[in-house]
């Protein structure tokens, strides 16, 4: 197993049944009414930043861009955590957000 492999792909390969159930949960959450898809992705970015998860930030930045979020919206969702999670979380995740936004 390569160390640069996507961690979520590793999870899916090692635990396919559990990953399938997790994907069902994610789909159920995505289908919730009340928030548009872009807002949901921006919230996910903020949550991943609060959790200090650059890999998650990168993934959700790419997903947010695909559904119409601007670079400014993506980076703002990260920086919004400054007073809540601190400078370290923002500095750790901002580069990942920018990198994820550049992905296709």
PLM region descriptions:
Residues 1-39, 65, 90-104:
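Acidic, glycine/proline-rich low-complexity segments that act as flexible tails and inter-domain linkers
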Residues 25-32, 46-50, 81-84:
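Alpha-helix C-capping/helix-to-loop hinge sites
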Residues 33, 50-54, 68, 85-88:
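Residues at alpha-helix boundaries and short interhelical turns
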Residues 40-54:
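Amphipathic, charged-and-aliphatic alpha-helical interface segments
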Residues 46-47, 60, 78, 97:
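Buried hydrophobic packing segments
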Residues 52-79:
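Mid-chain, well-packed structural core segment of small domains
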Residues 72-100:
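C-terminal structural segments of small proteins and small subunits
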């Amino acid at each position: 197993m390569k160390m640069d492999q996507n961690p979520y792909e590793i999870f899916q390969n090692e635990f396919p049944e559990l990953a399938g159930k997790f994907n069902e949960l994610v789909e159920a959450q995505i289908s919730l009414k009340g928030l548009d898809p872009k807002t949901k992705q921006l919230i996910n970015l903020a949550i991943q930043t609060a959790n200090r998860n650059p890999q998650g930030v990168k993934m959700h930045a790419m997903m947010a861009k695909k559904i119409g979020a601007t670079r400014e919206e993506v980076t703002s969702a990260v920086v919004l955590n400054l007073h809540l999670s601190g400078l370290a979380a923002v500095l750790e995740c901002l580069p990942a957000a920018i990198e994820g936004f550049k992905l296709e």
